Amino acid sequence: MTPKGRRPAALLVSPILPAAGGNGLAMRAGAFLDALAADHDVTLLLVPVAGGGDSADFTRRRVHRLATLPLENDSLDPLYSLGARLLDPAEHLAALRAYPRPAPCRWATSPALEAAVAAAGGARFDTVVVLRSYLAPYAAPFLAGSSWRLLDLDDDERLTLGRLSELYARRGQPERALLAAAEAAKYAVHERAWLPRFDLLLAASEVHEAAIRERHPGLAVSVVPNTVEVPETVRRAPRSPTLRLLFVGNLGYEPNVDAALWIAGELVPRLRRDGSPVELRVAGSHPLPEVVALAGPGITICADPTDLAPHYAWADLALAPIRAGGGTRIKILEAFAAGVPVVATPIGAEGLAVQDGEHLLLADDSNDFATACRRIQGDSLLGARLAANALDRVRESYSRVKGKVILQKLLSRSA
């Protein structure tokens, strides 16, 4: 129990700087930080394996202490370092596949953990919240002294990496396929070792919750959905003869890179075959060179946008042709909240409480995607109905306000 008159102390271990908007992982971290800060003195331990981020003001207003664990070579696991230095490509690949832990765990060494405790001001916290299973080893020194330990599993890394392996194989990238398959297998072992050390596991959807229960019977699991801000009013650009397509995402994340390349390389050319004008905007953080190279006539790459609202206001359709991944897509929820009709793959919409033809249109290949896009473009009533139903669903189930209530109830055990 927390002594009377003292706010409980919480440690949030995050792979990215929390934020109110932008990157989906940063937004989820931001939701956790916001909920924790309401009732706790929060120490944020940033282990920036997913990037540092640029929302320091949002974070500083909510934390008691901000500690960053530098990911430096002197704290790198020597076993990983040895394999990474091999020059022969086959030996290099074999060593990375044989490394026993998931790759993001490679800095979780004794020197790094000692530095983490020092940076956090000690190892005792009433509540410890860890975002992503691969950060669990970095929280090891803090678990024994905590009375309430939560692990957020918003992305199903095993599933994501398995799907990535299949995607790489289809694209003729056997080395990347082998490495992704090896990483997926490592996560299976990693989960068995680390998940039982937490009092409560959190999933982003009922689909992932069921998968966790099946893999790890007896462990406590709850759902914390991804959420977005719902604006009071929705502004849309006037209709145009040009079909305006939008894709939003972290453009350094492989499933999003694959989606952007597919839209520009397959979908847009198919839609333009009849001579109709089509414009595409790809907006997101940290675009890889192959994404930047997509820019051309009618295709705009918007790198690191500070505000996505103008892009959603411009768009006729938001696309989510995701072919790999294991969480729920905040990009779809943002489009719903902005009143933009969505066309997605079944994997893209996986885990969301939505129905094909009621909240969005689902499609699997370029033919089906093109047909769905033209259906919405040619039927304003269909687009309006999908957008209205989707906005209602966000308000009912995925608003930031409702998400905060869910989180605060789960976090209140130590308060």
Which functions belong to the PLM regions below?
Residues 28, 187, 214, 222-314:
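Conserved catalytic-core segment of nucleotide-activated headgroup transferases in glycan assembly
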Residues 199, 299, 310-327, 338-341:
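Acidic donor-binding loop of glycosyltransferase active sites
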Residues 81-137, 173-197:
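Conserved nucleotide-sugar donor-binding subdomain of glycosyltransferases
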Residues 1-71, 123, 139:
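N-terminal subdomain of nucleotide-sugar transferases
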Residues 150-151, 158, 180-188, 192-233:
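Donor nucleotide-sugar binding/catalytic pocket of nucleotide-sugar-dependent glycosyltransferases
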Residues 360-367, 375-380:
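Conserved acidic donor-binding segment of nucleotide-sugar-dependent glycosyltransferases
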Residues 331-334, 341-345, 361:
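Short hydrophobic beta-strand element within catalytic cores of glycosyltransferases
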Residues 382-397, 403:
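A short, well-ordered alpha-helix in the C-terminal region of glycosyltransferases
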